[in-house]
């Protein structure tokens, strides 16, 4: 009986240490947090937050860039219990400032800080969750993960299903661009490359295999252990909401942006499949309301044929036959030769 008690006590102590070791070792409130900037993203926040809670995220630092959809009130239940730190971030081109302010003010609160957008989802490929994945990087200051860009799944309008189960078609290859998960107290600056994609740190900056990374464009591309699923467009109708919001860095969001990024080459991706049952349970228990994506009035009664050129039309404009999937050079030539660009 005594041996059983001692064994149970030891197991309990191991569990407690495992769960709270970051507080003991690092003296931090959180092990893993996310910083993101948002503007009128209310229909997407619930799934994004609950999914990342499932991945072991302890806290969210959310910078609100002049939302007009009552985002703060919508998130109040999670702000009140300190799951979310809400930061008002007015003005244009505020993305880097958001990240700089959060790192400056809250660097002593969290061991790891993922710097991503609301349309980006951290995905562990082999680990149980992202928290487990990061446990292997104790002596590292920054982990660079590659994007997998997802297309529109040939959807003109959004269904009622989750983003993570609806959009399963993506490009053939991981993008060479990386996003950073950093130890914020080791950040040197965000301005070295004029981009938020790669953050300069004091200490080791590595990819998933602990190979050195020194730039936002990392051509030693790998996504075997973890990656970022980037739902950059979603449906064609939802793209128009993105277009009206604008890009936080000031990048033009137009039809060129849509057609260039819309790659559905690989079908039926299953990277999110194992998380869906538990995610739906999290969604059901969440205090956040389900918000429908607003309809775009001028799209009513339209379909893809109102916006896409046919191959024959493109060939006529270019003066030469085109490939089934247009090459970037062909698209560029099309823009130069056609004043119409795309049907409206």
Regions found by a protein language model. Give the residues of each.
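Conserved donor nucleotide-binding strand/loop of the catalytic core
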Residues: 79-94, 176
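Catalytic-site signature of metal-activated, phosphate-bearing donor transferases
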Residues: 97-100, 124-334, 343
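Active-site beta-to-alpha loop of glycosyltransferases that engages the nucleotide-sugar donor
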Residues: 36-50, 66
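Short beta-strand-to-loop acidic/aromatic patch adjacent to the donor-nucleotide binding site
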Residues: 110-123
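Cell-envelope/extracellular polymer assembly enzymes that use nucleotide-activated donors
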Residues: 31-33
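A conserved acidic beta->alpha catalytic loop
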Residues: 64-74, 91-92
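Short, acidic, metal-binding catalytic loop of nucleotide-sugar glycosyltransferases
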Residues: 50-58
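Active-site nucleotide-sugar/metal-binding loop of Leloir-type enzymes
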Residues: 100-112
């Amino acid at each position: 009986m005594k041996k059983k008690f001692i064994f149970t006590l030891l197991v309990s102590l191991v569990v407690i240490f495992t769960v709270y070791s970051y507080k003991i070792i690092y003296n931090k409130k959180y092990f893993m947090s996310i910083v993101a900037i948002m503007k009128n993203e209310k229909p997407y926040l619930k799934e994004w937050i609950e999914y990342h809670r499932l991945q072991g995220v302890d806290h969210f630092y959310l910078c609100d860039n002049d939302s007009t959809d009552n985002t703060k009130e919508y998130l109040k239940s999670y702000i009140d219990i300190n799951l979310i730190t809400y930061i008002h971030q007015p003005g244009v081109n505020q993305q880097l400032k958001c990240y700089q302010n959060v790192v400056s003010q809250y660097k002593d609160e969290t061991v790891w800080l993922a710097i991503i957008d609301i349309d980006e989802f951290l995905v562990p490929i082999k680990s149980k969750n992202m928290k487990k994945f990061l446990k292997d990087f104790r002596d590292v200051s920054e982990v660079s993960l590659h994007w997998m860009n997802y297309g529109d799944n040939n959807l003109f309008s959004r269904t009622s299903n989750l983003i993570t189960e609806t959009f399963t078609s993506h490009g053939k290859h991981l993008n060479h661009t990386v996003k950073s998960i950093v130890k914020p107290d080791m950040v040197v600056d965000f301005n070295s490359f004029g981009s938020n994609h790669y953050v300069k740190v004091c200490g080791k900056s590595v990819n998933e295999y602990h190979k050195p990374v020194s730039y936002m464009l990392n051509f030693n591309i790998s996504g075997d252990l973890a990656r970022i699923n980037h739902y950059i467009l979603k449906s064609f109708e939802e793209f128009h909401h993105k277009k009206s919001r604008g890009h936080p860095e000031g990048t033009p969001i137009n039809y060129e942006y849509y057609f260039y990024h819309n790659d559905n080459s690989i079908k039926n991706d299953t990277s999110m499949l194992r998380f869906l049952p538990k995610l739906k349970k999290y969604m059901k228990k969440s205090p956040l309301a389900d918000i429908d994506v607003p309809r775009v009035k001028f799209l009513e009664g339209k379909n893809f044929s109102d916006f896409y050129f046919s191959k024959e039309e493109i060939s006529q404009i270019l003066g030469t036959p085109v490939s089934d999937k247009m090459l970037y050079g062909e698209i560029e030539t099309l823009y130069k030769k056609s004043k119409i660009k795309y049907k409206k």
